[in-house]
Amino acid sequence: MKSVKIMGTMPPSISLAKAHERISQHWQNPVGELNIGGKRYRIIDNQVLRLNPHSGFSLFREGVGKIFSGKMFNFSIARNLTDTLHAAQKTTSQELRSDIPNALSNLFGAKPQTELPLGWKGEPLSGAPDLEGMRVAETDKFAEGESHISIIETKDKQRLVAKIERSIAEGHLFAELEAYKHIYKTAGKHPNLANVHGMAVVPYGNRKEEALLMDEVDGWRCSDTLRTLADSWKQGKINSEAYWGTIKFIAHRLLDVTNHLAKAGVVHNDIKPGNVVFDRASGEPVVIDLGLHSRSGEQPKGFTESFKAPELGVGNLGASEKSDVFLVVSTLLHCIEGFEKNPEIKPNQGLRFITSEPAHVMDENGYPIHRPGIAGVETAYTRFITDILGVSADSRPDSNEARLHEFLSDGTIDEESAKQILKDTLTGEMSPLSTDVRRITPKKLRELSDLLRTHLSSAATKQLDMGGVLSDLDTMLVALDKAEREGGVDKDQLKSFNSLILKTYRVIEDYVKGREGDTKNSSTEVSPYHRSNFMLSIVEPSLQRIQKHLDQTHSFSDIGSLVRAHKHLETLLEVLVTLSQQGQPVSSETYGFLNRLAEAKITLSQQLNTLQQQQESAKAQLSILINRSGSWADVARQSLQRFDSTRPVVKFGTEQYTAIHRQMMAAHAAITLQEVSEFTDDMRNFTVDSIPLLIQLGRSSLMDEHLVEQREKLRELTTIAERLNRLEREWM
């Protein structure tokens, strides 16, 4: 940026008269020019326009931004010049402006006004609203690259975004509309992609302008949304599970959009925080702005430098679904890490690992200070970022493969919970959590195990505190559920703790029935608590927690949690029935609690049975799929291993080297595909069936260990088949 200079400009003190004279007499010359790194830009009406906007439009914007933010010593020249020209434009008489040749008129944005009437231009898409009686709700709400953005309101109060062309970008809105039409026709509409209606003539100030109309998404951009979400996490308004589960929900939605675009053969090319808007009403993320789209394999019209995939800057590699996947992950990284606070860090550079020094520095109170883009330990999150941003295009997963990554398939929360969290984030209705948000550690589980053993010892001596042990068990169920989701405790320790909990329930049941040890001498006194006190302090909190659990959507990984909750309800019923039989008449309050416990147990049993049946069905499908792979699995595995061991290393350099590398890769791919040619259809059909099943099975630990083994075998076979299926479209 040190080479920036102003060329052909008037002094900062240029008068309005001089500005008028320059406009009228020297229209053929640039009004003001910048020269940045040998590239020329014009200063027009307080805007800087690249003379060739299709060669890195966003790249120049970053550099010029420094001039107008006061970071350059000579920024005042550009500012004063454009302020003066702006004033001259406003005060120039209509007669003078009409004499200005079209070239200069267009330079100042004064393009000829359309003669078409207000309303749709041509046939709008199906479902488009009636524009009769429309009015301008907001003008220039924000500017989007090559467009002005205004909000139009119909007589039915529907708000539409009007994307209006600037003169320098004439024709790009029609191309964008054609892209949406193509997507809708070939792949259909998508709830997380902007809903476009067509081109229309709309009011804009005292003019009429042609605009691309689409539904307004009322909400926040990605950076603001995730920054507020992170603040809620830090303030204890949501816990770690909710925060990361919501991040994963967003990632799944965005990758579903890139997969949808790929089905239509379209690449977005400009997914970034500013082009993802979160709907305040639904909590859903919506991808907008197809202005820089291309067809798969074509060179992109442009991109945002700090987010783009590296292959788009080397040789002649075209845009692809994988470059859009790269954009999704760099966008998420930017928002999660808070890169907007440090513009020198680029999200497409990925995470930087530091092992020679602490990844976090401490403040004066000894608390860690987050350093954006720095990782000191490997986690599923860091592996996800590295597996997509840190590999070449041929090794990068596509949308469906990325969704199968351990980071996105483990520790998820149900969609409705994630959307509610986002809606609360957008409306500012988050309330602090009262629960402990710290992670469950192995030490914590050992402490809880020791507490259970103490209760078991008390039972052996007929001194069991029934209320105390049931209250502790309720707390331990929550802790074990959380530990299983977080994945920070060894699987064997989790299994041991689960067994100890179930054993404690059996001991309580025997104790209540008077069969602990020598049943002939056992006591039937189960608790010093009065019935009412027991129900209010022990039964009620457990019922409320389990009822919330029942209202959620569950996956196979929740079966263990539901089994434990079912056992807890059974034990509470057993204890309460026994208390009710000790001499005094049963009160209406006790009947009420017994009925609520019984109803909750029935509902839980139904949900558990349904989930177990679905798991059995999935297990049967899994077995069938693995058997189907028998005809091709060994041949495909060996062919892929040979391809990986013989293919040349990716070279980055000149166009010539890139072309040579692609030729060599194509040759190796052709040999590999020939080896498995008779199984191509089988493998393609296999992945169509296996990928949805793998998403359903997830990556979390399951109670059925044999099912886990079969699931991982299916995952390996799917990876082999999917990679071979991609070879032709990637290299040939």
From Swiss-Prot:
Binding site for ATP: 142-150, 163
Active site: 270 (proton acceptor)
Pfam families: Pkinase (PF00069), Rac1 (PF09632)
Enzyme superclass (EC): transferase
InterPro entries: Kinase-like_dom_sf, Prot_kinase_dom, Rac1-bd_C, Rac1-binding_domain, Rac1-db_N, Ser/Thr_kinase_AS, Ser/thr_kinase_yersinia-type
Localization in the cell: Secreted
Gene Ontology terms: cellular component: cytoplasm; extracellular region
E.C. numbers: 2.7.11.1
Keyword field contains ATP-binding: yes
Domain Protein kinase positions: 136-408
GO molecular function: ATP binding; protein serine kinase activity; protein serine/threonine kinase activity
Substrates-to-products reaction catalysed: L-seryl-[protein] + ATP = O-phospho-L-seryl-[protein] + ADP + H(+); L-threonyl-[protein] + ATP = O-phospho-L-threonyl-[protein] + ADP + H(+)
Chief subcellular location: secreted
Keywords: ATP-binding, Kinase, Nucleotide-binding, Plasmid, Secreted, Serine/threonine-protein kinase, Signal, Transferase, Virulence
Gene3D superfamilies: Rac1-binding domain, C-terminal subdomain, Rac1-binding domain, N-terminal GTPase binding subdomain, Transferase(Phosphotransferase) domain 1
Family statement drawn from the similarity comment of this UniProt entry: Belongs to the protein kinase superfamily. Ser/Thr protein kinase family.
Function, as annotated: Acts as a virulence determinant.
Protein name in UniProt: Protein kinase YpkA
